């Protein structure tokens, strides 16, 4: 790989590290200070809204605006946001301050990551684009693994201020490197219409294709939104509440739990690559079934009088399995979209798929935040109800795929795995990346 690509990789590492640390620490800080799962859910949900709105616009901007300037401006904005947080912490409302910081963070990343992805073809040789894209994607996954672990350790030992300071320094270093080192060729594109009108046209064209020619894809995306409403939101809100409040463990343990989620995502991606020739799209719902069943041990943790460390081990194992299975389903789903969508629509359809699949995430976080507060003394029904809902959605997905693939006569059976992403099942406060089954930093995948 050439020097230009290496320089982009270095600045991406710095920026995504700061992003992952903050996405983990700020909602947990709200939970620690207020003790309210509902407030933590509200903070996380509010932060998601600009991400959902700006992601399609970010894709258009990445194609039409100087990519180097976008990256430098966003990292500078994030560094200044961290500085403002440190200056205002303790003097203004905590929840409002965290919401503002996370909104800026999510909004920036909705534009930053598409810009990095769009820069790859300009700085990597044609024969190395697939490899370069895979490297960029793996850096994102690794940041979700390392960031929460380090963030949890620093937050648990020293509090929120050093965490924000470290993240701000990472953003500042990234901005300086972009200005001094990164070089991305840029040719100004002619624009016949405004960005918003262009985005609206892309969405309309993509939706018309899905509804008219590939309804099986549209139905599957909506079912993934259901998974994000239930299973993903349960994990995002339930994991930190369970670890820090119900089990009474230090914040460092929550960092390791988030690391387990990220490791599950990496493991799922590796397994799909290894088993690619044996997996078919018709088998994909099996992974959703397994993810749903993996919630049952969490019900035991919430209801049985187990030793905290034993309960923590069961919880971490369950989170790992959930994320691995969600990622495997996501990768198969996004590969199916790539194969079944005309080349000129692929990017637009994937962007629409990610927005639709993630749109239920904020609603789920609000609902589960309220449930964990209202039913703090008896959370077993919440876990069992979530598992039951996920099993029903998995069964519906199985039915939709079997009927849809047969009815539409698609030639896709064994799905060739793409190295560039997955359909987001969102499981992360750190991030979503595939057909998003969201287990957002607890990692955003269908993602």
What is each stretch, according to the model?
Residues 95-106, 128-189, 259, 313, ...:
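Hydrophobic alpha-helical transmembrane segments
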Residues 1-9, 37, 95, 99, ...:
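Primarily residues marking transmembrane-helix entry/exit sites
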Residues 24-25, 158-165, 208-271:
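A single, central transmembrane helix in multi-pass transporters
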Residues 7-23, 47-60, 66-78, 97-156, ...:
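Substrate-agnostic recognition of the 12-TM MFS/MFS-like secondary transporter fold
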Residues 32-33, 63-64, 90-91, 122, ...:
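Membrane-helix boundary and inter-helical linker elements of multi-pass secondary transporters
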